[in-house]
Regions:
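Short glycine/proline-centered loop/turn elements that form peptide/ligand docking sites
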Residues: 117-120, 131-136
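Residue-level detector of anion-binding/catalytic polar loops
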Residues: 29, 130
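Substrate-recognition "cap/lid" segment bordering the active-site pocket of phosphatases
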Residues: 31, 37-112, 118-126
Length: 136
């Protein structure tokens, strides 16, 4: 019963998502890292029209489709998703960001994090990566 009310308040940060799409077009990689459940992350991304990672450009195990032209993901897709269940210690511990970096094969020096919550900002700071504070 909470989802319809919650989804009414969820809005895409257009400037941030434009940056992410341009970054991906230039060979950058974009991940969603959240302490939320994978089901909640998937539901929010579907609501916003953002697709998740796929194998060979098909449908991922979560049902997301790849590609900007796919009607199921009209705004494009991300390269990876990490949920709270993927790490032992949630934010403000840096584990979620460090695990995403490990999976992507990059270092904190090669990583840029965008965060909107106090605990997320603390986790980003503790990860050693550069970060921006996003106001929603």
């Amino acid at each position: 019963a909470l989802y319809p009310t919650f989804f009414d308040t969820v809005r895409l940060n257009e400037p941030l998502w434009t940056f992410c799409r341009q970054f991906r077009a230039g060979s950058g990689r974009v991940w969603v890292v959240s302490t939320g459940s994978r089901a909640n992350i998937d539901n929010v991304m579907r609501h916003l029209g953002i697709g998740g990672p796929t194998a060979e450009g098909g449908v991922s195990e979560t049902g997301f489709h790849s590609g900007v032209t796919d009607p199921a993901a009209p705004l494009g897709r991300v390269d990876g998703i990490l949920s709270g269940a993927d790490v032992e210690r949630p934010k403000p511990a840096p584990d979620c960001f460090l695990e995403a970096m490990r999976r992507e094969g990059c270092t904190p020096r090669e990583t840029l994090i965008f965060e909107d919550s106090a605990i997320g900002i603390e986790a980003a700071r503790r990860s050693g990566a550069s970060y921006f504070v996003v106001k929603l």
